[in-house]
Amino acid sequence: MIPARRRLLTVLAGVSLSAFAPPAPPSYSIDAIRYATVPQFPLRALVMGAPESEKLDIAMVVWLIRGSGKVILFDTGFHREKWMKQFTVTDYVRPDEALRAAGVPPETVTDVVISHAHWDHMGGIDLFPQATVWIQKDEFAYYTGAAWQPGGRHGGIDPEDVAALVRLNTEGRVRLIDGDDVEILPTIRVYTGARHTFASQYVRVDGEAPVVLASDNCYLYRNLEARAASATFTPEDRDANLRAQERMIALAGHRDRVVPGHDPLQFARYPAAGRVARIR
């Protein structure tokens, strides 16, 4: 009788403790989706110190993060014709249609995280009608204001994209992130300091094997391997970019878990089918 009673008490104690146990953190899958290619892009524009003659077909990519009822897109690509002509874009599929082809209707995207305001990263924010848009507060403020004043810098920024961002803000769909190392969604954190644009950010997706999605804060694996800066907001920001790359490696726990912004090798290093590579 006593052993049976003890067993019952043990079971009841376990049930009681489990009621107060914290919920398990969300587990996200991560996919890279290639929606276009820019052929024969000068490597020197991507990797400081690269030979002038070297060129690369760069991948145009958005990243899909899914789990716990969330469908999150990191960067949105672009769809304006002028940029296709300027950069001789090939193999193009509009980003929302690239998602649909991967089995994800664009209207199911719950959140969009913008790394920075350049045309090929923020240019598709109007393609995902139900999504909340996350962007750094300082990036929003600069590119809707001082960037267009005398002495401002707005290279690579499309005024139509800025207008779309402002409109979404007036509709209550924009969330402004205030600074570095902020958890915007459970186990998804953003970090600043790489200075690709005025206040560019990158994402860490936590888990047993954390992944850092660098976007243009680190263009290629070659940046990491050669410890070479990506393009920065001003030339004086190069050291900040290198420090950020080191931080990305530390945050990911290994250099191989840092995913660069435009490297076609991510579709060779990870299992891939068509336009989609499974990062995790």
Residue map of PLM features:
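Active-site glycine- and acidic-residue-rich loops that bind
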Residues: 189-201
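Active-site metal-binding loops of divalent metal-dependent hydrolases
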Residues: 35-36, 76-79, 117, 138-139, ...
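Metallo-beta-lactamase
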Residues: 2, 7-11, 18-104, 108-120, 138-192, ...
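Hydrophobic/aromatic beta-strand patches that form the interior of the parallel beta-sheet core
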Residues: 31-33, 113, 134, 175-177, ...
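Cap/insert and terminal regions of metallo-dependent hydrolase folds
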Residues: 89-92, 200-280
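Short, conserved loop/helix-junction motifs that constitute active-site signature segments
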Residues: 126-129
